[in-house]
């Protein structure tokens, strides 16, 4: 079977289960694609060729013995450089961590592996996932957007998005605390899921025995990237569940009760009223039309709840938590790599103890306001990033660039802050670059987001896999 890397994850797994292709052949096909494409885009940082072939051979033996090999049998996936894979360094893109070998798989890696999927490589990130939105690490260099090398692939899960978009992997495992799955998905023309806080188990004790602070515990969620919504759904069904390493993860059903009547969708093309690029506005309009055609009750809404207040609280809480570690982190980021965070630290001073207590109360109140909004409108349609893909490093260039990027990702930031699920889905091309939208839902109603994203995809199409251009 030729060019197995062009197949969907669902088709790849089905081909392995039927015996049309072996898992080893599937992995080898992706390794050949990586050898062909990765030198041009620099997305895969650590290739796990021998480990992947060994895992694939075990899957083939299971099938030969009559044992079901799993819903993702043989499907290759990449893993963000921040997420442990047993026996492989977890570098965060930092030379100092090049020998930090993981002793066990992170919970989401373990769940994908248990479903038959095969980790094939780590994928690039911004240094320490803190050097900015562009995927450039001190250890591995720049990752290139396959649609246009003059535009960023986004971040911080940019390596996974590029790997999936170019067919080097069928799935990518990233994480998102303010757009880090969804923005690369838009910029690279793939689909991405940020789940509800507590939907997927995780363990972010990577650099030592201590857990992160409360903001990191609440904001960071692991999430998959895929070329189609159907593949995203497969990954969602596998990743959801509980794990004793993560007391936040809840045993909530994958699918909620059907809603009566047509599902209402609130459309907010310009959240916060700060402006939106015409191409992105057109993408939101196209997705709204697709949902109307699919029978959704689509309504224009003035704005989302408490946008400015949420952005301010997000910034102050995260800076306050981060401030004690800033001197050490600044050294790890190195000259130039610290500019993005340094500007944030200068602009937003840490809160006092009393201020932090009040901010935590504000956080709960904002979450309540969003729960009430989504009780009336079970889905929200809006932009992922309010511009097409921007130039690499814009956010680190100067204060104006940082402000522009912060404004562009504002809906991602706020939806991470309130812990609700969102699916990014492509809508087409504008001037040769991918456009997309996100569908945001009630807490633990990822199924509603996926259903609506599928309706958009069915009417507007899939953009990838793509060969690198330029």
What does each model-identified segment do?
Residues 104-236, 416-429, 433-438:
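Short glycine/serine-rich loop segments
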Residues 1-54, 293-295, 465-470:
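An N-terminal boundary/leader segment
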Residues 19, 30, 74, 114, ...:
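Glycine-rich, small-residue loops and helix-cap segments
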Residues 72-92, 260-268, 317-371, 424-434:
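Short helix-loop capping/hinge segments that flank enzyme active sites or metal/cofactor-binding pockets
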Residues 79, 119-122, 173-175, 300, ...:
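General beta-strand structural signal in soluble alpha/beta enzymes
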Residues 194-282, 460-469:
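A short helix-breaking turn/cap at a secondary-structure junction
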Residues 52-54, 62-137:
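Acidic/His- and Gly-rich active-site-bordering loop/insert found
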Residues 30, 52, 232, 265, ...:
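Residue-level signal for inorganic ion chemistry
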């Amino acid at each position: 079977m030729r060019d197995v890397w062009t197949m969907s994850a669902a088709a790849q797994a089905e081909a392995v289960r039927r015996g049309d292709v072996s898992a080893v052949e599937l992995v080898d096909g992706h390794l050949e694609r990586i050898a062909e494409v990765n030198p041009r885009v620099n997305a895969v940082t650590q290739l796990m060729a021998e480990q992947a072939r060994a895992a694939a051979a075990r899957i083939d033996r299971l099938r030969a013995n009559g044992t079901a090999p799993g819903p993702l049998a043989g499907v290759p996936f990449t893993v963000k450089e921040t997420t442990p894979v047993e026996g492989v360094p977890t570098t965060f893109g930092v030379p100092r961590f090049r020998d930090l070998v993981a002793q066990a798989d992170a919970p989401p890696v373990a769940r994908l592996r248990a479903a038959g999927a095969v980790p094939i490589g780590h994928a690039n990130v911004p240094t320490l996932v803190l050097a900015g939105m562009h995927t450039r690490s001190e250890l591995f260099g720049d990752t290139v957007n396959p649609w246009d090398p003059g535009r960023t692939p986004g971040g911080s899960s940019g390596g996974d998005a590029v790997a999936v978009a170019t067919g080097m992997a069928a799935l990518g495992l990233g994480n998102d605390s303010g757009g880090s799955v969804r923005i690369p998905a838009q910029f690279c023309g793939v689909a991405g899921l940020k789940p509800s806080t507590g939907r997927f188990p995780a363990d972010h004790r990577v650099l030592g025995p201590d857990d992160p602070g409360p903001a990191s515990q609440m904001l960071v969620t692991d999430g998959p990237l895929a070329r189609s919504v159907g593949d995203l759904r497969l990954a969602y069904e596998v990743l959801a569940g509980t794990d004793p390493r993560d007391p936040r993860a809840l045993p909530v059903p994958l699918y909620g009760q059907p809603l009566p009547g047509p599902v209402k969708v609130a459309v907010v093309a310009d959240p916060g009223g700060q402006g939106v690029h015409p191409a992105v506005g057109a993408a939101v309009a196209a997705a709204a039309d697709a949902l109307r055609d699919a029978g959704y009750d689509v309504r224009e809404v003035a704005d989302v709840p408490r946008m400015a207040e949420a952005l301010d609280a997000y910034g102050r809480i995260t800076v306050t938590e981060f401030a004690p570690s800033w001197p050490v982190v600044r050294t790890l980021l190195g000259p130039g790599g610290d500019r993005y965070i340094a500007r944030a630290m200068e602009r937003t001073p840490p809160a006092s103890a009393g201020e932090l207590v009040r901010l935590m109360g504000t956080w709960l109140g904002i979450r309540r306001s969003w729960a009430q909004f989504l009780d009336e409108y079970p889905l929200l349609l809006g932009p992922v990033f309010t511009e097409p893909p921007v130039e690499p490093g814009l956010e680190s260039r100067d204060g104006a660039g940082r402000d522009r990027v912060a404004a562009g990702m504002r809906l991602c930031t706020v939806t991470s802050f309130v812990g609700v699920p969102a699916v990014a889905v492509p809508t087409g091309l504008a001037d040769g670059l991918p456009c997309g939208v996100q569908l945001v839902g009630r807490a633990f109603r990822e199924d509603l987001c996926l259903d609506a994203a599928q309706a958009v995809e069915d009417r507007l199409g899939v953009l990838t896999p793509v060969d690198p251009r330029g």
